[in-house]
């Protein structure tokens, strides 16, 4: 049993937790991802013009939907994470005057993304996309919640390679133009270590640096927070129709959200 502590790199915005996974667990996940089959990552893009760039993202990826693994990861990291988002600056998802206090930590996205970087592969500057959905619990209260991810959970599955650091860059009000982020020096550099978790807010500019030798494997999911919400009448009908004695009813599928002012986004 590992003793786990979270180390703050930039307040709550960036932190690391060593030994979230053991070496054996990491190797098992690499094998599972390889068995699932990697494919070339799609081009990434963003910006107000929504133009895609074909050149920067050269890694491979695979997606495994696994609620039990997502729950396992959440059980390990959640005791070390903020229970609410009170610390986070107000944004479009917060009610004015309340901030993040109405959001409480609830789980990890079950859409687990595995990424594989070979020699000379990288992922230049980008911001992370987020996920959201609406659920309702099939109990006496029939309470509905809006779930939204605000934090990225990235786990390094190996460290027997050179390069591949995660670098964070200075804040920029907008990164609409390429010149806004070129030639920036990183303010934080995270060296990969097997089994270590990196947690960061989605809307912070960072990169996965070029792998110099070897192969780099990482696992990404997202930390979900939820708040009470009122269902649209059409969703209420869906909820009633699909109750079927389940503990919870997924009212909407996962929706992806990307920072519109950033030239790069990351799923």
Regions found by a protein language model. Name each.
Residues 1-197, 203-267:
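Fe(II)/2-oxoglutarate oxygenase catalytic core
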């Amino acid at each position: 049993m590992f003793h786990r502590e979270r180390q703050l790199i930039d307040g709550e915005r960036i932190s690391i937790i060593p030994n979230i996974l053991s070496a054996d667990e990491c190797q098992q996940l690499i094998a599972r991802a390889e068995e699932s089959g990697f494919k070339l990552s799609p081009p990434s893009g963003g910006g107000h013009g929504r133009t895609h760039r074909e050149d920067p993202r050269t890694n491979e990826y695979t997606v495994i939907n696994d609620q039990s693994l997502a729950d396992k990861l959440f059980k390990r990291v959640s005791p070390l994470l903020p229970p609410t988002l009170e610390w986070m600056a107000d944004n479009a998802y917060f009610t004015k005057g309340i901030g993040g206090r109405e959001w409480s930590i609830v789980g990890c996205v079950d859409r687990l993304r595995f990424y594989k970087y070979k020699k000379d592969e990288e992922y230049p500057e980008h911001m992370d996309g987020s996920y959201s959905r609406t659920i309702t619990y099939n109990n006496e209260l029939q309470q509905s919640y809006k779930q939204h991810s605000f934090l990225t959970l990235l786990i390094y599955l190996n460290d027997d390679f050179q390069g591949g650091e995660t670098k964070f860059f200075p804040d920029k009000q907008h990164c609409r133009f390429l010149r806004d982020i070129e030639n920036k020096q990183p303010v934080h550099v995270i060296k990969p270590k097997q089994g270590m978790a990196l947690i960061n807010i989605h809307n912070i500019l960072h990169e996965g640096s070029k792998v110099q030798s070897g192969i780099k494997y990482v696992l990404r999911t997202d930390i979900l927070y939820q708040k009470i919400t009122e269902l649209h009448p059409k969703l209420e009908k869906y909820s009633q129709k699909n109750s079927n004695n389940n503990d919870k009813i997924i009212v909407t599928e996962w929706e992806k959200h990307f920072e519109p002012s950033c030239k790069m986004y990351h799923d």
